[in-house]
Amino acid sequence: MKKQLFLTLAVAGITATAIAEEARLLRFPATNSKDVVFAYGGDLYKVSLEGGQAQRLTSHIGYEMFPRFSPDGQSVAFTAQYDGNTEVYLMPAEGGQPVRLTYTATNSRDDLGDRMGPNNVTMAWTPDGKQILYRNRISDGFDGR
């Protein structure tokens, strides 16, 4: 009886740990009027606010994070680390080839474990949808272009 109780508790503990580990992989959600886009395990996914099966938007080598819908919901801006640098990218909200928007070459500041977070964090869009706001940590004369 004690052995069965121990095994039951052990299996329950392992299951709870696995669920908690998986939940920690889901990060940085952003919504528009009908969908939520989020990072999960380093890739971006989108799902209806009503629920359902999430659609994988990216599957690149490197991390994608901090997704933000455009005001019209047609595009997603996000931060990604593909070629060593952490840069801002843009792609259609339905998925597709990302377009790199920033070229800052800041390898020394792109440590994902840094307490300040990575460089070029996508923050928001302007209300008219013409510009993407992002946080950049360059302090040596970067002029915002």
Residue ranges and their predicted role:
Residues 4-14:
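Sec-dependent N-terminal signal peptides
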Residues 21-47:
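Beta-strand-rich domains and repeat architectures in extracellular enzymes and scaffolds
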Residues 39-75:
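N-terminal, post-signal-peptide region of Sec/Tat-exported proteins
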Residues 16-20:
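Sec/Tat signal peptide C-region and signal peptidase I cleavage site
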Residues 21, 40-45, 60-64, 79-89, ...:
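A flexible loop/linker signature enriched in serine peptidases of the S9 family
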Residues 30-33, 67-75, 122-131:
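Blade-terminus and WD-like Trp-Asp/Gly-His loop motifs, strongest in beta-propeller folds
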